[in-house]
């Protein structure tokens, strides 16, 4: 798993000799009907909009991240339809690696939860099982390609823990909603770790918004 910052909306507006920050652009657009639109102070404004649920202003700025994950987790991410995505395609490129999942026990009281309480021998068995499945499936995948079978067909042999990469672009509003859902304990651990890493990047670029959300 890896999350990498790619891009952020860059305002071209300059106020009092200083370029407007992405957060400043949110406030600038929020004040579209105000004669005080170029007010450089926006902390209280953003706090107010978050507190009162005026979310539309947070659609004025986008952030793009690169996410490296697996074919098991990618569909969960792609389910967030307010984002725009570009994903690594196994129709055109070859699979080269897999991600080893840790063995966790199913929580019988909560189907959305799993428990990290297996003994080391069970964890070792699960790691070895994943390695064996990858080795065999990747061998057959390579054989299929060597026989001239199209990548779009050969990829069906590969397991769900095959590594993939995608770009995820969304507005600040979309990211806020994504974090509220996917940083929660109800989210699968592997996906939650991605969301937490993404939120850490978000907090760096939107400190005022993050503080208002009490992150």
Swiss-Prot record:
A motif (ThyX motif) lies at residues 79-89. The active site is at residue 182. Its EC number is 2.1.1.148. InterPro entries: Thymidylate_synthase_ThyX, Thymidylate_synthase_ThyX_sf. Keywords: FAD, Flavoprotein, Methyltransferase, NADP, Nucleotide biosynthesis, Transferase. It catalyses: dUMP + (6R)-5,10-methylene-5,6,7,8-tetrahydrofolate + NADPH + H(+) = dTMP + (6S)-5,6,7,8-tetrahydrofolate + NADP(+). It is an enzyme of class 2 (transferase). One of its GO terms (molecular function) is flavin adenine dinucleotide binding. The keyword RNA-binding does not apply. Residues 1-215 form the ThyX domain. Binds 4 FAD per tetramer. Each FAD binding site is formed by three monomers. The keyword Ligase does not apply. DUMP binds at residues 76-79, 87-91, 155, 182. FAD binds at residues 56, 79-81, 87, 177. Gene3D superfamilies: 1.20.5.3070, 3.30.1360.170. Its cofactor is FAD. It comes from the Bacteria. Pathway: Pyrimidine metabolism; dTTP biosynthesis. GO terms for biological process: dTMP biosynthetic process; dTTP biosynthetic process; methylation. Homotetramer. Belongs to the thymidylate synthase ThyX family. Catalyzes the reductive methylation of 2'-deoxyuridine-5'-monophosphate (dUMP) to 2'-deoxythymidine-5'-monophosphate (dTMP) while utilizing 5,10-methylenetetrahydrofolate (mTHF) as the methyl donor, and NADPH and FADH(2) as the reductant. NCBIfam families: thyX. HAMAP family: ThyX. This is Flavin-dependent thymidylate synthase. It comes from Synechocystis sp. (strain ATCC 27184 / PCC 6803 / Kazusa). The gene is thyX.
């Amino acid at each position: 798993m890896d999350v990498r910052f790619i891009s952020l909306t860059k305002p071209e507006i300059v106020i009092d000799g200083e370029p407007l920050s992405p957060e400043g652009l949110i406030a600038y657009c929020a004040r579209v009907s105000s004669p005080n639109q170029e007010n450089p102070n926006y902390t209280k404004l953003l706090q107010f909009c978050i507190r009162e649920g005026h979310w539309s202003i947070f659609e004025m700025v986008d952030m793009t991240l690169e996410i490296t994950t697996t074919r098991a987790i990618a569909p969960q991410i792609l389910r967030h339809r307010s984002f725009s995505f570009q994903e690594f395609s196994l129709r055109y490129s070859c699979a080269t690696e897999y991600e080893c999942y840790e063995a966790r026990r199913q929580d019988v009281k909560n189907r959305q939860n799993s428990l990290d309480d297996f003994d080391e021998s069970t964890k070792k068995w699960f790691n070895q099982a994943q390695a064996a499945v990858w080795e065999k499936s990747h061998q057959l995948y390579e054989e299929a390609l060597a026989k001239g079978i199209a990548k779009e067909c050969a990829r069906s042999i590969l397991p769900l823990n095959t590594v993939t990469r995608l770009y995820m672009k969304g507005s600040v509003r979309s990211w806020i909603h994504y974090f509220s859902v996917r940083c929660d304990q109800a989210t699968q651990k592997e996906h939650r770790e991605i969301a937490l890493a993404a939120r850490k990047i978000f907090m760096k670029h939107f400190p005022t918004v993050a503080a208002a959300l009490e992150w």
